[in-house]
């Protein structure tokens, strides 16, 4: 995972050491390196509870940290450089095809652990956040509130980055890699929400 962590840091993306699968330990109820019985997110969470302070976009620091934990997954904190819209894998693939057909610009898109991740522009923590952060329409648009299978990862959250794996399936992979974006800005999340919400609704029906 070292090469992946260093590559993300070189993009200016903060990276964090992640927990990792424990071989065949799933049958014993200990599928995660954190050794917590019944871990709710096996191999899909940071190694340390201090992950927000430990996040780094320095390639040198990333290389040093993964040199000591080469098996660690790569965690990408959200709400800093990007947010992530997270939907079930099938719905995400259908939505991506619809966006391409409609000429809707998309950014990096990854898949893994039965989910599809759409990387979008972040809202970060603007100076006037107190005016809108608790507002349902701005913080969690109606589409998100009504579609329980659609998650919006923003500040204080994170996602598992390819080629990390949670032990339940194959490693994550990019459908549209960051390097393929050619310097284009990340899309506005709101522009993608309607298509993603519709795709999630179709999957549930």
Name each region found by the language model:
Residues 1-113, 123-124, 175, 179-205:
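Signature for HUH/AEP ssDNA processing cores
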Residues 112-115, 147-148:
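Short, surface-exposed, polar/charged, turn-prone segments marking secondary-structure boundaries
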Residues 118:
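Catalytic core of tubulin tyrosine ligase-like
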Residues 122-205:
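DNA replication initiation modules
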């Amino acid at each position: 995972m070292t090469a992946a962590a260093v590559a993300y840091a070189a993009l200016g993306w903060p990276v964090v050491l992640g927990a990792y699968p424990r071989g065949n330990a799933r049958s014993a109820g200990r599928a995660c390196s954190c050794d917590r019985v019944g871990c709710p997110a096996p191999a899909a969470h940071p190694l340390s509870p201090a992950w927000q302070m430990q996040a780094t976009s320095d390639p040198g620091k990333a290389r040093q940290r993964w040199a000591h934990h080469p098996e660690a997954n790569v965690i990408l904190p959200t709400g800093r450089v990007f947010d992530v819209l997270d939907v079930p894998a099938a719905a995400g693939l259908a939505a991506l095809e619809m966006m391409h057909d409609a000429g809707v610009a998309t950014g990096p898109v990854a898949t893994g652990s039965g989910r599809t991740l759409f990387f979008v522009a972040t809202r970060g923590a603007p100076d006037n956040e107190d005016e809108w952060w608790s507002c349902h329409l701005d913080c969690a648009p109606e589409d998100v509130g009504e579609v329980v299978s659609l998650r919006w990862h923003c500040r204080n959250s994170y996602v598992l980055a390819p080629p990390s794996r949670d032990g339940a399936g194959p490693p994550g992979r990019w459908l549209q890699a960051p390097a393929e974006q050619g310097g284009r800005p990340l899309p506005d999340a709101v522009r993608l929400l309607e298509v993603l919400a519709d795709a999630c609704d179709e999957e549930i029906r």
